[in-house]
């Protein structure tokens, strides 16, 4: 693991310790299945459904000791309405998650991201 340039968390669903994240500053990328800062933590599609949202999304971000609070690398959304079930939201969101995570990892390995405070600048 010591020779890795990036760690990618896809459906990992575990909280990393501060000791671990401090060793990998801005080198761990997580995909969160909501448009952060909305619906932090577990089961965001259910949270979105219960709020009756009109957009669902995904966020790729660098992992910090604070859950789902790291600098955002990429986000995208899809429009939904009251007819969508939680299962349908998850299915639609899965494709958004794949696209967002792929772009974030690509930009990271191509050194196209600068982190400034808790924000990122991504060069195209």
Where are these regions (language model features)?
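Glycine-rich phosphate-binding loop signature in dinucleotide/nucleotide-binding domains
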Residues: 1-4
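Donor/substrate-binding cores of folate-linked one-carbon enzymes
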Residues: 6-124
């Amino acid at each position: 693991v010591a020779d890795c340039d990036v760690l990618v968390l896809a459906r990992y669903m575990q909280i990393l310790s501060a000791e671990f994240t401090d060793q990998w500053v801005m080198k761990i990328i997580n995909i969160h299945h909501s448009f952060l800062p909305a619906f932090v933590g577990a089961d965001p599609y259910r949270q979105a459904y219960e709020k009756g949202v009109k957009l669902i999304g995904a966020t790729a971000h660098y992992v910090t000791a604070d859950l789902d609070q790291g600098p955002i690398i990429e986000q995208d959304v899809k429009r939904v309405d009251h007819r969508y079930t939680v299962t349908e939201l998850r299915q639609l969101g899965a494709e958004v998650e794949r696209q967002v995570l792929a772009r974030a990892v690509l930009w990271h390995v191509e050194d196209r991201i600068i982190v400034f405070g808790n924000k990122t600048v991504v060069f195209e």
